[in-house]
Each structure stands twice: as C-alpha cells, then as structure tokens.
Amino acid sequence: MNRAGLGACASTGSARADVGSDHIPKPTQTEPVEARALPVPHGKLTPNAPLAPLVWFKSGGTAEWLFEPTDAADLQAFLADLDPSVPVMALGLGSNLIVRDGGVPGVVVRLGKAFAKVLPGADLTLDCGGGASGILVSSTARDHGIAGLEFLRSIPGTVGGFVRMNGGAYGGEVKDILVDCDVVLRDGSSAQLGTSLLNYTYRHSTLPEGAIVVAARFKGRPGKSADIQAEMDRISSSREASQPLRSKTGGSTFKNPDGHKAWQLVDAAGCRGLTIGGAQVSEKHCNFLLNTGAATSAEIEALGEEVRRRVKARSGIELEWEIQRVGNQ
C-alpha cells in the first residue's frame, strides 16, 4: 500500500460509511499525524472531518482523519500499514458518544453500506455486518421467524457497538444471542472471537484495544413473525412513552449500579431538569442528557460530572458513565 503525507487529501475510491463503536481509546497526547505518513486506501480518507454531524449530541470537534473503508480487506490493509503509534477509533451511529470539543486525534473508522448487510443463516442464525443497525437486525429476524432479538430494536446503534459493550435492554443482552464475531485488530490481522473470549459483563467486554467488529453472528429461537412484531411494537411504545427520542441526546448516560436504577438515583439527588449552559438533564427521563440547542461537549460532560457529584453526595453511590467520552478537551 502506498503512503501519503497528511498535507494532501488522500481520498480515493468509493466512499462508504458506518460501524459500532468497538473500542474507545482514552485521550492521548500524540504526535500530529501530519508529521507522519498515512497509507493510501481504496476507501475514503478525509482530513479534519467534523464529527458533530455524525453523533447524536450534535456537538464536538473534528477527527484528525476519518476513514471509510470499502470492505474488510481495505480496512485490514490500511491498519497493517498504519504507524502503530496512531490512535484508531471506530464510530457507529454516534448515539452513545460524547466527542470532546478538541477533536479526536488519529484515525476514526466508520463502516458503510458494505458492512451493513443482514442475512439469514442456518439454525436460526443471522449473519450481520458490523455496520448494521439494531432495527435492521431485529426486523430481519422477525421476517425469518427468529425470536429473541427484539430488544435490539430499542438500542440506537450498530452491531459493532452492541458486540463491544454487550448492548442490552428490555431483558436481553448481546451475550445471550452472540455466536461469534469477526474483528480486524489494530495491526490489520483478523480474528474470530466467541463469547467466551469476550468475557462479557454488564455493558463491557474485553474486546482488544483498537479492534473493529466487521461482522457478527447472532442466534435466536423459533418464533412467529406476528408475535415478534408485537413484542417489537411493545418495546417501541415503551421507549416513546419514557424517553426523549426526538432530542439531541446520547441515550442512557450512566450504568445502573447493582440493585439500583441510575435514573432513580439522579432524580433523588434533585437533578431532573438541571442545566449547565445548553446542556440539560431530561425532564422526561433523567438518565438522559440533552443538547437543548448549541451546547458544547464540555457543557454536556460537565453536566454529567455534576450529576455524578450530587448523586455521590446524597446516596454515597458513584455512578459510572455508560456514554463513551473521546478526544481532547
């Protein structure tokens, strides 16, 4: 693979878009990529790409580089030839993410249409691309009489993100339906990982740092399409009634501590409706933070930290962020 300096816009081939947030690296102070050479892929490589339009909060800085590979082979070749010191982060639908205002160093990878397919397999399985949405996965399962995947309808994200964080809702979790997943590791090599290698716990896995999920296989149980649709409708109605779905939000902000509901702790601490700048704790569901207009990511994150402080002061419980926070302040 050829290399190009960052001074030029290394963009060739067809543009693709979208993967789950498979690993979110911690902010690092690294040498600007401009000082190094980047591989020239077949896909689209964009410098200083605004990320705010790609995330649900509609706030935050730019990606030093945004890479949209044409296929898994393109991603593998690019990562294999990329300087190992360059940070790599995967971006899905951007629903569980605060991109800090200083932007994200290194390369942000976004998987597109080539990674968004969902096909039925044998024995009540589905073969899903890492960029496929939860709605597409659950709808395809319904169409083929595969029950047990309805809960994915309620998670705003992509397969890669579900696999990385053991996504779950309404009594279901990815660990209960995952057969295995195909990942491209940071060095460009590939691996197939089963659930035993991911060591799933609540909203967490041990997916290797820098790994990107390009495909996954889910297995359900026999069901009638009408019954599956009824359950999906029930879930959809419940979300509509209880969550601020039409707001600029990142989804559930804090993990539920053992034996507690995060929203109840937030409410008891008097944080419902609390604001900092343009950021607000939702009145409808107080485990959701909102961008009410032109909030900065700094304001949104500061509001979350203030909520954590107040909850700790009142209940002694330290809330853990469920939303990922990436990039430089």
Where are these regions (language model features)?
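Beta-strand secondary-structure signal
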Residues: 66, 127, 180-182, 215-217
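Short polybasic amphipathic segments
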Residues: 116-118, 179-183
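Intrinsic disorder/low-complexity segments
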Residues: 1-40
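Anion-binding (especially nucleotide phosphate/pyrophosphate-binding) glycine-rich loop
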Residues: 38-159, 169
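A generic local secondary-structure boundary/capping motif
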Residues: 97, 138-141, 149-153, 166-173, ...
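Phosphate/pyrophosphate- and phosphate-bearing ligand-binding catalytic cores of soluble enzymes
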Residues: 46-47, 97, 184-305, 309-329
